[in-house]
A protein has these predicted regions:
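His/Glu-based metal-binding/catalytic segments typifying zinc-dependent metallopeptidases
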Residues: 16-42, 193, 200, 219, ...
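Acidic/histidine-enriched alpha-helical segments
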Residues: 64-65, 120-144, 230-240, 333, ...
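Proteolytic maturation boundary segments
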Residues: 1-18, 210-247, 402-422
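M16 family metallopeptidases and their MPP-like homologs
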Residues: 15-17, 23-43, 60-116, 152-175, ...
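Non-catalytic, conformational "gating/processing" segments within enzyme and secreted inhibitor domains
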Residues: 185-221
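Hydrophobic alpha-helical hairpins/lids featuring a short glycine-rich hinge
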Residues: 92, 100-149
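Active-site SXXK
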Residues: 43-51
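Hydrophobic side chains in well-ordered alpha-helices
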Residues: 110, 191, 214-217, 272, ...
Length: 422
């Protein structure tokens, strides 16, 4: 599949992937804006409110009926964080023209409906309906609270909040509970007008329709959107290493400790760092899993994640409170083993295979392709999955070791039980 990216209007770009192997087409529209603590919650709430109805289809029942008429098409709202960019919008999925009864064309009516959801939402006196705002605000607060209920997710979020305190990357895609609870309809509508007027709009299409049809359908569907004084898509800034390791402990009513460790990466060798992280803790054959969890039984789980947009690696683990120091020391010991090249051939080849397979499967799913290219756009990269896989296949062990030698501990976060000894 050969990707193309076309400017349709000021601040409006279309990424198109022609494909005939799927029975559906996918159409996505995403507003790209800097993520900030002050605006994240309102912008996260916005697409849920927009999805409640348009002036022509003023409630979810009417919208659902129209989607049913389009052979069960779907329009779902999305809230994502890519690098230091908050991406809010919609993804539509519908039967590809090649598979509709009589070859009926669905691209144009689906694009038109998507344009109504974005540009002509149901309003009263120039504001969103209060009942829609209230209902979706409750859902947003519940989503934020659900992170707290899953202590693994909560600890991962708290590590990023502490490591990237004062930086956009430390802000949750949903914002914080206090801000979300206090949101008013006026604030949500202000967020709407702000995004319409200044946020870049990234469109994505994957299906069999020609470029001319896709562009014409989207131009017609979005013709009523205001002219944009567009901000640039924010590019993530690499995290600057601290002179001293930051250590944070939270006390909570938990029975299992959560140890998180954040590391800075001083190298920009992306392929080498991807391989190094996979060897360290990015797969079920990685050193953290095989040694810290399986061999030494110091963790219930242990894994690492390379945040390429930010140039950091984070470790997530669940431990007994009394095993904090042992797990902490062993995690660093396993990192040093990778840095020193203490790896078997099967580990290297296993890591290559894991990453190459992951890149290969992106092309098997339209939603994965959309998510991948949204991330590439948000971070200013244009590498294809195939190019990334080739980079992994050809990176030498020496490059991996050298890149991983630049990885250093920055932040330690520990969630433990109240009154528990460490």
């Amino acid at each position: 599949m050969e990707k193309t990216r076309t400017k349709l209007a000021e601040g409006v770009y279309l990424t198109r992937l022609p494909a005939r192997k799927f029975k559906t087409s996918l159409l996505s529209a995403q507003f790209m804006t800097p993520i900030a603590a002050e605006t994240a919650a309102a912008q996260a709430l916005l697409p849920a409110v927009l999805r409640r109805g348009t002036m022509r289809y003023p409630d979810m029942g009417a919208l659902s009926t129209r989607l049913d008429e389009l052979y069960g098409a779907e329009i779902d709202y999305t809230v994502r964080k890519k690098g230091e960019c908050q991406c809010v919008g919609f993804v539509a999925s519908f039967i590809d023209d090649a598979f509709t009864p009589g070859g009926e064309k669905l691209l144009e009516p689906v694009a038109e409906l998507l344009g109504q959801v974005i540009g002509n939402p149901v309003t009263k006196d120039g504001r969103f309906l209060p009942e829609y705002v209230d209902s979706e605000r409750t859902n947003l607060v519940d989503a934020i609270r659900s992170i707290l209920n899953d202590k693994r997710d909560y600890a991962d979020l708290r590590l990023l909040q502490e490591m990237c305190a004062g930086e956009p990357y430390g802000v949750s895609r949903f914002g914080d509970e206090k801000t979300a609870q206090a949101l008013t309809g006026e604030q949500v509508y202000e967020a709407y007008t702000r995004l319409l007027s200044s946020a870049p709009l990234e469109l994505f299409y994957c299906g069999s329709a020609s470029a001319e049809r896709v562009e014409a359908a989207l131009m017609a569907a979005l013709s009523n959107l205001p002219h944009k004084a567009v901000q640039a898509i924010p590019q993530s800034q690499c995290h600057t290493a601290r002179k001293e390791v930051k250590r944070v402990t939270d006390l909570m009513d938990v029975t299992q400790g959560k140890l998180g460790m954040g590391f800075t990466c001083g190298s920009d060798d992306f392929s080498a760092l991807m391989m190094g992280n996979t060897l360290f803790g990015g797969s079920s054959n990685a050193k953290l899993f095989m040694n810290v969890r399986e061999k030494l039984s110091l963790c219930y789980y242990a894994s690492s994640l390379f945040h390429r947009q930010k140039g950091i690696i984070t470790v997530s683990s669940g431990i007994e409170f009394q095993n904090f120091q042992k797990a902490y020391d062993e995690i660093q010991h396993q990192l040093k083993a990778v840095q020193d090249g203490k790896l078997e051939d099967w580990e290297l080849e296993g890591a290559r295979s894991t990453l190459c397979n992951a890149y290969a499967t992106i092309g098997d799913s339209q939603s994965k392709l959309e998510n991948f290219w949204l991330g590439q756009t948000a971070t200013g990269r244009d590498d294809t999955p195939e190019a990334l896989a080739e980079g992994v296949r050809t990176v030498s062990p020496e490059r991996i070791y050298e890149a991983m030698k630049t990885v250093s501990l920055d932040t330690v976060y520990f969630l433990k039980g109240e009154g528990a000894e460490q």
